[in-house]
């Protein structure tokens, strides 16, 4: 395809050079640029793509999309100037792969907590209903029944559109994806044709990137601002930010809630270690997930399925068959009678939700919590997480969790600042995460609950740029001498 044809996807400020040249590929990473590729110079958080135009030229690129025109323009090159290269990359990526999202019923899920569970359960539900479907998530990507590894919650525009192209070519009718705040802010989802948007909740997270809660909210809201009139916007009415999200959307707005008036409502009747009895839209259903947060997730899945035109009774029947997502309230029972739970909870609110779910299940028995905080991330949440964990646990172990470029001992000390004198008496500081988990299991007795929070599905510990193999679930099973039952 000629460069001239791609220009219709952009709103160029200026075009200098030959637009008749063929474009063989599109690249935003100069290391991946090939002969005849169109190089898009995107300004990132750590570097500026404009700096790598010479390298892209050396590797054979002769067409460039830029925000700033270079002083020197090599002969035979074409420079297309636009106001926003990130936005341009999204449009070009969609066009390069034949606008694949237009051939899918695409639903995006955003929010601080619950994105992975909601997107994954929707994918599983629609597969069980006989549809071919795709999934883009933190844990794994799926093209129908074929899994693909994932590196980001939301991939870059080129990888994302390539993935949707594979889904469309495989005959998928539906696609469900997590939409991170980073992806929205960086316009990775620009030019995608969404048929639905879902908002789960909003609490403190990613302030190391966004700077403030209002900016974090604004990034999430931009997703709904971009929805078309043909789409639905399903929001949590029990979250004060739910209706803020859809203030400026053109989409059809609908709500779900456990407490407030909403289009889709549910009530928890009874809680068990292996599930909950619920009323959902005045219909009784037993579900195999645990916790109020999962009641919201399931209700959200139900509402979205109904908005997509599915039969309500059939949706409820399949909802009762669905089980938890890997690393989300994943339970292991020891031969000694205590229960260990591995969960991805890595924000104060998520930690509170999980511990508040465990407390009534533990009854008079102990709750032992193992938790850390990620390095190079929002430092403000560290003492809050320790404080909230201590309030809800009989024993607390602070440990390492992806320290990245920071010293793990320093992160742990920053967490410990949130502890009172009394809290410190029941707290252990153990830097080695495996030792921390083993210690928690040694302290546990029959009927106790051990929560290992923060990593969930992750299979690595990131230290100074290197991802070392580490899986909380493997360590738990080893501590239980592999005599466990996965619920």
From Swiss-Prot:
Q: What is its EC number?
A: 6.3.2.13
Name what cofactor the protein needs. Mg(2+)
Q: Which residues bind UDP-N-acetyl-alpha-D-muramoyl-L-alanyl-D-glutamate?
A: 30, 153-154, 180, 186, 188
Q: Does the keyword Nucleotide-binding apply?
A: yes
Modifications the protein undergoes after translation, according to the UniProt entry:
Carboxylation is probably crucial for Mg(2+) binding and, consequently, for the gamma-phosphate positioning of ATP.
Q: Where does the chain cross the membrane?
A: none
User: Primary place of residence?
Assistant: cytoplasm
Q: Where does ATP bind?
A: 111-117
Q: What class of enzyme is it?
A: ligase
Q: Where is this motif: Meso-diaminopimelate recognition motif?
A: 401-404
Q: Which PANTHER family match?
A: MUR LIGASE FAMILY MEMBER (PTHR23135), UDP-N-ACETYLMURAMOYL-L-ALANYL-D-GLUTAMATE--2,6-DIAMINOPIMELATE LIGASE MURE HOMOLOG, CHLOROPLASTIC (PTHR23135:SF4)
Tell me which HAMAP family the record gives.
MurE
Name of the protein this chain belongs to = UDP-N-acetylmuramoyl-L-alanyl-D-glutamate--2,6-diaminopimelate ligase
In its UniProt entry, the species of origin is given as Porphyromonas gingivalis (strain ATCC BAA-308 / W83)
Gene giving rise to this polypeptide: murE
